[in-house]
Amino acid sequence: SNTYILKRKILTFTKKFSRKLSKPERKFTADITYGMLASGSCLLTDVCDQLHEPSQKINVVDRLSRHLEKGVSASATSAYLQQVKKWSSSEPIIYIDDSDVVKPDGYKFESLGIVRNGSESTSTKSVYKKGYHVTEACILTSANHPVSIFSKIHSSHEKDYKSANTITFQAIEQGNSLFGKATFVMDRGYDDNKMFLKLDELGQDYVIRLKSNRKLLYLSLIHI
């Protein structure tokens, strides 16, 4: 059946990253990947519905939650990134952007902060709600498919939190470590001397859309 074929393909795919993990962790990797793809959702209750396990739903949710709480192991992350590297072109382009996850009705979420809600804000009006910042870095594969190489949810309310720039630098360093040389593409929100200096320090090429009030000095001439 189509379901069986899909499960086999996902199992083969996830084995590339979970080969060195324990048996329960390998099962979790396959279950969560299949469940999200089959349900089109990241809600654990929806994922459970697709797994059709004999255990009670709440027990399956608890099992998945425990594994998620552990995070992604270093070995699985390394195996994933090496696979992504094989999919990329010889001249990789890395896209970095910030987004937000809004939780307006949340009260018990850990380190819940205040973020600018991108879906409701405009160029003349900013709408702020409870939520988290998300920093994402991805590349285009040789088949022009976007694939993540860095993804982090963060909040200024976290203990020992430094700045959003610190997270962006981590994304840049991840790309630099993985590819050695790449072209970084970023929106006007990254029009910042700190970004230019960081990318220059690493010897990377970059394309950053400038803000309208940016003054550019080129060959001793100022361009506005």
PLM regions and their residue ranges:
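Intrinsically disordered, low-complexity and often Lys/Arg-enriched segments
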Residues: 1-8, 12, 16
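An internal, acidic/charged active-site-proximal segment
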Residues: 152-222
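Short, conserved catalytic/metal-binding motifs centered on acidic residues
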Residues: 47, 93-102, 137, 183-191, ...
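Short, positively charged, Gly/Tyr-enriched micro-motifs
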Residues: 16, 20-75
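A short acidic, glycine/proline-enriched capping/turn motif at secondary-structure boundaries
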Residues: 100-103, 142-145, 156-158, 191
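Active-site-proximal, Lys/Arg-enriched surface segment
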Residues: 61-142
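A general structural motif
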Residues: 89-91, 132-134, 146, 179-182, ...
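Short, flexible active-site-proximal loops enriched in glycine and acidic residues
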Residues: 59, 142-149
